[in-house]
Amino acid sequence: MKPKLMYQELKVPAEEPASELPMNEIEAWKAAEKKARWVLLVLILAVVGFGALMTQLFLWEYGDLHLFGPNQRPAPCYDPCEAVLVESIPEGLDFPNASTSNPSTSQAWLGLLAGAHSSLDIASFYWTLTNNDTHTQEASAQQGEEVLRQLQTLAPRGVKVRIAVSKPNGPQPQADLQALLQSGAQVRMVDMQKLTHGVLHTKFWVVDQTHFYLGSANMDWRSLTQVKELGVVMYNCSCLARDLTKIFEAYWFLGQAGSSIPSTWPRPYDTRYNQETPMEICLNGTPALAYLASAPPPLCPSGRTPDLKALLNVVDNARSFIYIAVMNYLPIMEFSHPRRFWPAIDDGLRRAAYERGVKVRLLISCWGHSDPSMRAFLLSLAALRDNHTHSDIQVKLFVVPADDAQARIPYARVNHNKYMVTERATYIGTSNWSGSYFTETAGTSLLVTQNGRGGLRSQLEAVFLRDWDSPYSHDLDAAADSVGNACRLL
């Protein structure tokens, strides 16, 4: 039995009624709270933005140091890149007025020189911008002489000029280079014969690491008025220009006394941009993918696509047509002893025509220095054109006409182009198409993929079709006397 308990109510002290705040103080408190939230938000955004900015600056400065995985694409380039095809049309070679036309090589070079502010790097095969080598007073040499005069003004006005040139294997005029040295330019000769048994056949300029020229034209007065040349000038495209400078820096390094090709190139020479991860650029107002390739493979640091691999990739990815304009086409190691067959490009073209039904057109140069053995290989390719196999390969020879005076100019009157265009891609290079140029000789190419009409690709296609349909293009079975004695392949 429970004891009887007396319960008492537990008394809790009554709370005093809270005093109400005046309305103006409440509103002030709410305003202060709102302001604090905004300040915190702004602070957070500032920290995030600063972090993003520092990350971008870090990648911009050190992005080449293998920070990207195999499946990660580098950041796009936001430069307003402008590409302009430039040509040298030999005197006396005339197209109809309505034909495709482009600015001249000399006009483009002089414009680049006039606009140079801080630096000019030139990779070159040889130098003869005056006609001293011919011991004549050839009037058409004036454009080359003017280019040399303007080059001599750069160093005195504070522009750093560096020239990498192939070391000659024999006697070669050096007056141009001596004049440039005296004006303050720096010159290094690259002994490619010792390094790879080849030559430095590259032809490009980089101006202020912002603009560049790349193409077939040598530093030769004939390349401006007596030889048919094609190249591209890229304006306001520092992303690509800086990448091309890396190729130049490799030549510059190899031009030092006693230098050799590194077994592994130091990281500053590496690139992020290649066949697998091309640079995303805005080219002439249109999205495009671009990268630079190099030859021979020992001169390709990490990330750099070899020139031959890049060329074959364009061939293998063509689905409609492949148009090629090149001075020499030889599926051999041209300078090899004993002789060696080299079918890498030839196989790719045959496969494209036979397996995928791609229309293949080759416009090959014919002049007094053409290798006669080229004819048999060209006939072999052309023989694949067959209604039963539906293979469509055509070959034509381009002959630059010459009068008696022009015919006496040595190493002139030839189509020196080195490019390819498909329905998808543009390839503009500095090499002839035979094995040694890709395995031993230094060369560079620009590759661009761009959709739509009016871009670089369609402009190059128009140039090819103009030349292909011109009276200067001849079938392989044309009569030799119909084109004069300049062509050795008929």
UniProtKB/Swiss-Prot annotation:
E.C. no: 3.1.16.1, 3.1.4.-
Membrane topology designation: Single-pass type II membrane protein
Family annotation (InterPro entries): Diverse_PLD-related, PLDc_3, PLipase_D/transphosphatidylase
One Pfam family here: PLDc_3
Subcellular location: Endoplasmic reticulum membrane; Lysosome lumen; Early endosome membrane; Late endosome membrane
Glycosylation sites: 97, 132, 236, 284, 387
Superkingdom: Eukaryota
Alphabetical list of Gene3D superfamilies matching this protein: Endonuclease Chain A
Alphabetic keyword roster: Disulfide bond, Endoplasmic reticulum, Endosome, Exonuclease, Glycoprotein, Golgi apparatus, Hydrolase, Immunity, Inflammatory response, Lipid metabolism, Lysosome, Magnesium, Membrane, Metal-binding, Nuclease, Phospholipid metabolism, Repeat, Signal-anchor, Transmembrane, Transmembrane helix, Ubl conjugation
Disulfide bonds: 77-239, 81-237, 366-487
GO molecular function annotations of the record: metal ion binding; single-stranded DNA 5'-3' DNA exonuclease activity
SMART domains: PLDc
Topology feature Cytoplasmic, residues: 1-38
Location, primary (coarse class): endoplasmic reticulum
PLD phosphodiesterase domain sequence ranges: 196-223, 411-437
Protein family per UniProt: Belongs to the phospholipase D family.
Assembly description: Homodimer. Interacts with APP.
This protein's name: 5'-3' exonuclease PLD3
Organism, as annotated: Bos taurus
Gene name of the record: PLD3
